[in-house]
């Protein structure tokens, strides 16, 4: 160690002397002495490393309190923060999928603040079942005999397969071996559930006879998987739910369909592309139907299993059910969301997913015109800003080939450099409430379909 290095080390303030500084004492009052001392020690160690490696004091040596305050603020920033979703994808998986209805938010808030009847029966002051109230509501809405709720649709499929067809073959069309995000594949789920996949048909055409010919003494389930995140078009054929249900009844085998997204209302009646509903397959005679809670339903993340009472009871008693069950907050949000489906006249207005999906291009274009002057004031010197027609996506693997006419503010760098667009997108991502758009075709696009609070966006630009 050189004389200069020793001199630099000697200039480092002690913990005790730092704690007597007024600004640091203020931080102690706010966060507690243990917390502050721990962070001061980390700063001291970092300072020693800087001296050892660079033979100089850290830049913040003369203002430990300010550096400490900045470090604490950075550390205490929320890991998950609200953003403006202007990507054009309504159910954006990476941005949290469905927004909650206000009644669902209030319901979650209430059960977080107070004990609740999660597994308590007020009728007999005894233990109840956490799924029961929501199961009754689902049965009322869909005509199912019973229902089960778990933490997502992948869990619903896993639990259903593990209960219905352990150590058995599950017959599925080759064209329905779906992979969802994160390389999560139906064949892999079957393997984890202890089932054996029996592929039938071809990628583009599967017939009822393919299912029939695959049945043997090892068959445990006849299954369909709705290809919600891709579409096979052209020379195609698939087995209808009524056909599969009839074959299952004839051969005394259970039948099931994994809907993936699953809509609880007729989207076509709302002017949207059609998506199969669970109640349709139940009416066709399918024994079990699974789907998601946080996609087209517009509720919290959950997996829902509907179907025959005997099978649902068996599913409820499977050991995996306890590992996959949902908490009181999910159940409260799901309950409140489902109750909105009992009021069709309020449903579209009160469920954000349906409200956003049904917005007209004219409405969105009018919003773009109101916002354009504000963006020009901030960014007009460096960017050409225009209003452009565009196509929104539903997202989360729902209706993959369908799109919704929308409108966007688009930005093109006046110097023609793509790096300027990257810089602008990065700037927006670093705002207190980040603005998330997309760069395509040499422009930065802000699709306004999912924007409902114009003033909040304008305010975000000024921060």
Swiss-Prot record:
Its cofactor is pyridoxal 5'-phosphate. It is found in: Cytoplasm. It is an enzyme of class 2 (transferase). Signal peptide: none annotated. Its EC number is 2.9.1.1. The keyword Ribonucleoprotein does not apply. Its main location: cytoplasm. GO terms for cellular component: cytoplasm. It catalyses: L-seryl-tRNA(Sec) + selenophosphate + H(+) = L-selenocysteinyl-tRNA(Sec) + phosphate. Belongs to the SelA family. This is L-seryl-tRNA(Sec) selenium transferase. It comes from Proteus mirabilis (strain HI4320). The gene is selA.
């Amino acid at each position: 160690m050189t004389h200069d290095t020793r001199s630099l080390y000697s200039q480092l303030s002690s913990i005790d002397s730092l704690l007597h500084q007024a600004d640091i004492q203020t931080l102690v009052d706010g966060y507690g002495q243990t917390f502050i001392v721990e962070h001061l020690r980390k700063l001291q160690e970092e300072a020693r490393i800087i001296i050892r490696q660079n033979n100089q004091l850290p830049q913040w040596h003369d203002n430990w309190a300010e550096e400490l305050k900045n470090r604490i603020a950075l550390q205490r920033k929320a890991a998950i923060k609200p953003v403006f979703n202007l990507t054009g994808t309504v159910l954006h998986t990476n941005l949290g999928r469905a927004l909650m209805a206000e009644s669902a938010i209030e319901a979650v808030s209430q059960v977080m603040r107070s004990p609740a009847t999660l597994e308590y029966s007020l009728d007999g002051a005894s233990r109840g079942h956490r799924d029961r109230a929501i199961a009754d509501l689902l049965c009322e809405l869909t005509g199912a005999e019973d229902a089960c709720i778990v933490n997502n649709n992948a869990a619903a499929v896993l639990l259903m397969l593990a209960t219905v067809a352990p150590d058995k073959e599950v017959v599925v069309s080759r064209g329905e071996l779906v992979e969802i995000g994160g390389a999560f594949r139906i064949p892999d789920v079957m393997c984890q559930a202890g089932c054996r996949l029996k592929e039938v048909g071809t990628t583009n055409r599967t017939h009822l006879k393919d299912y029939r010919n695959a049945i043997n003494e090892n068959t445990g389930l006849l299954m369909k998987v709705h290809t919600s995140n891709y579409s096979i078009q052209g020379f195609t054929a698939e087995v209808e739910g009524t056909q599969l249900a009839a074959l299952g009844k004839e051969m005394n085998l259970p039948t099931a369909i994994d809907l993936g997204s699953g809509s609880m209302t007729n989207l076509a009646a709302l002017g949207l592309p059609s998506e199969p509903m669970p109640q349709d397959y139940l009416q066709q005679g399918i024994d079990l139907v699974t789907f998601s809670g946080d996609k087209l339903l517009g509720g919290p993340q959950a997996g829902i299993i509907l179907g025959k009472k005997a099978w649902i009871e068996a599913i409820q008693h499977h050991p995996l059910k306890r590992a996959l069950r949902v908490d009181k907050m999910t159940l409260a949000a799901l309950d409140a969301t489902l109750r909105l489906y009992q009021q069709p006249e309020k449903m579209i207005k009160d469920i954000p997913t349906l409200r956003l999906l049904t917005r007209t291009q004219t409405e969105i274009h009018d919003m773009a015109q109101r916002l354009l002057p504000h963006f020009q004031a901030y960014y007009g010197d460096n960017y050409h800003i225009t209003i452009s027609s565009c196509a929104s996506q539903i997202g989360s693997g729902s209706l993959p080939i369908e799109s919704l006419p929308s409108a966007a503010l688009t930005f093109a760098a006046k110097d023609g450099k793509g790096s300027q667009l990257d810089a602008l997108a990065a700037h927006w991502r670093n705002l207190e409430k980040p603005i998330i758009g997309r760069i395509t075709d040499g422009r930065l696009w802000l699709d306004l379909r999912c924007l409902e609070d114009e003033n909040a966006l304008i305010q975000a630009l000024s921060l």
